[in-house]
UniProtKB/Swiss-Prot annotation:
It comes from the Bacteria. This is Transcription antitermination protein NusB. GO terms for molecular function: RNA binding. HAMAP family: NusB. Residues 115-135 are annotated as: Disordered. Keywords: RNA-binding, Transcription, Transcription antitermination, Transcription regulation. It comes from Frankia casuarinae (strain DSM 45818 / CECT 9043 / HFP020203 / CcI3).
Length: 135
């Protein structure tokens, strides 16, 4: 699917949705579409032995949402973003996916100078200190 088609598909689904799609879900989709290149770079950097194309599509998209939350949603504590991603992987993907998702996201958090997942209660200004990141 072309990234440029996502906004049109989202708008059509929102118009037909009953019950309505949450505002937060819409923000996540829009955020991933807007920052997909940056998000995919981060995933590729920490996906040891895997390319994005080789990952199961479900894992790839779970990771995209989690990376968006970890790096661009200071209102979401790191631990919550990681736990939710692991739960999604448990429920929607392969038996190996939860460990893969957890390991990749933990490495990303540690590698970017953010709090380790076990210690994280939020990021505060830590995200602002990431080189090349918008404040």
């Amino acid at each position: 699917m072309r990234a440029s088609a996502v906004p049109e598909i989202l708008a059509a689904r929102l118009a037909q949705s009953d019950p309505p799609v949450s505002e937060y879900a819409v923000e996540l989709v829009e955020g991933v579409v807007e920052r997909r290149g940056e998000i995919d770079e981060r995933i590729a950097r920490y996906a040891e032995g895997w390319t994005l194309e080789r990952m199961p599509p479900v894992d790839r998209n779970i990771l995209r949402i989690a990376v968006l939350e970890l790096l661009w949603r200071p209102d979401v504590p790191d631990r919550v973003a990681i736990d939710e991603a692991v739960e999604l992987a448990k429920n929607l993907s392969t038996h190996r996916s939860p460990a893969f998702v957890n390991g990749l996201l933990a490495s990303l958090v540690e590698g970017k100078g953010l709090a380790t997942p076990a210690e994280s209660t939020g990021r505060g200004s830590a995200v602002d200190s990431i080189p090349g990141q918008p404040s």
